[in-house]
Amino acid sequence: MEECWVTEIANGSKDGLDSNPMKDYMILSGPQKTAVAVLCTLLGLLSALENVAVLYLILSSHQLRRKPSYLFIGSLAGADFLASVVFACSFVNFHVFHGVDSKAVFLLKIGSVTMTFTASVGSLLLTAIDRYLCLRYPPSYKALLTRGRALVTLGIMWVLSALVSYLPLMGWTCCPRPCSELFPLIPNDYLLSWLLFIAFLFSGIIYTYGHVLWKAHQHVASLSGHQDRQVPGMARMRLDVRLAKTLGLVLAVLLICWFPVLALMAHSLATTLSDQVKKAFAFCSMLCLINSMVNPVIYALRSGEIRSSAHHCLAHWKKCVRGLGSEAKEEAPRSSVTETEADGKITPWPDSRDLDLSDC
């Protein structure tokens, strides 16, 4: 297989780009290359910054990083950050600059892109399962899903994502057989296997979200039957309804961003694609990048504890900047004491519990 790849590249170098086997996948015109470069750079940079911010807020808070719910959200943010960086760089290098790497490097890049997006979907599935357990078994939730079990589950998910994604690098390639219409060196049988795996993850997400939304419906019915008297757990039930709406929103965004890409991948298995369809696939692929950009926005807006953590960080940085601006040496000790006292008085936003994603 290595000889096949080397021979094709060597022949391409002799006859020019027209004979390069990778040229069939480099189908963008000049204006389209510019559009892809601009969109990938902006979306990738914004997505990376957002996800880094979410990761920092979770890891810098002792309270958040001990909760399984936020471990799953942190895993999602980490996967989306890696996806933003790896996908944007690899996509622009290939489609805009026509960069051709060695077989091992190319398969490493495409495997890394596949792994990060697969881990992102896997993290969403674990988040959905976490919400289901919270709503289905509220009394025993904390004993059922401990921090240790959450970490073990995340480790298994990441290892499985890496194993599935790096199979082409381990030898499952198409050379010398015909490759996929959309991905160099990737055989159609591997693409079909990956599509089935992703379909399994999506099915799990939809099935779990369905139970979450049904549980929310039951809470609404319970609320309507106890309007005239105070019932313990009422606030929790209202919270669960909002959580269900949040998960429904995440699911809708996930399907909108992923369905076009997955549909074109499945279509490529059944027929030969024209250059127009390949160009459409290239632009639809950036919808996955948009999904990575939207995920932290949804969680930042919905999670009261993350917003409270951001409020603490901003207040702390603001006071640090003010402290650095103090020129009088005799004012330094008093300024430090004042800042410490002010930090101790900072309280979460009044509505932080209303949208808390992990209040189970």
Curated annotation (Swiss-Prot):
Its main location: membrane. InterPro entries: Canbinoid_rcpt_2 (IPR001551), Cnbnoid_rcpt (IPR002230), GPCR_Rhodpsn (IPR000276), GPCR_Rhodpsn_7TM (IPR017452). Constitutively phosphorylated on Ser-352; phosphorylation increases cell internalization and desensitizes the receptor. Preferentially expressed in cells of the immune system with higher expression in B-cells and NK cells (at protein level). Expressed in skin in suprabasal layers and hair follicles (at protein level). Highly expressed in tonsil and to a lower extent in spleen, peripheral blood mononuclear cells, and thymus. PubMed:14657172 could not detect expression in normal brain. Expressed in brain by perivascular microglial cells and dorsal root ganglion sensory neurons (at protein level). The modification Phosphothreonine is found at residue 338. Gene3D superfamilies: Rhodopsin 7-helix transmembrane proteins. SUPFAM superfamilies: Family A G protein-coupled receptor-like. GO terms for cellular component: cytoplasm; dendrite; endoplasmic reticulum; extrinsic component of cytoplasmic side of plasma membrane; perikaryon; plasma membrane; postsynaptic membrane. PROSITE patterns: G_PROTEIN_RECEP_F1_1, G_PROTEIN_RECEP_F1_2. One of its GO terms (molecular function) is cannabinoid receptor activity. Glycans are attached at residue 11. SMART domains: 7TM_GPCR_Srsx. Residues 1-33, 93-104, 173-188, 268-279 are extracellular. Residues 351-360 have a biased composition (Basic and acidic residues). Keywords: Cell membrane, Cell projection, G-protein coupled receptor, Glycoprotein, Inflammatory response, Membrane, Phosphoprotein, Receptor, Transducer, Transmembrane, Transmembrane helix. It is found in: Cell membrane; Cell projection, Dendrite; Perikaryon. It holds the Pfam family 7tm_1. It is a multi-pass membrane protein. Residues 60-71, 130-149, 215-246, 302-360 are cytoplasmic. The modification Phosphoserine is found at residues 335-336, 352. One of its GO terms (biological process) is response to amphetamine. Belongs to the G-protein coupled receptor 1 family. Heterotrimeric G protein-coupled receptor for endocannabinoid 2-arachidonoylglycerol mediating inhibition of adenylate cyclase. May function in inflammatory response, nociceptive transmission and bone homeostasis. This is Cannabinoid receptor 2. It comes from Homo sapiens.
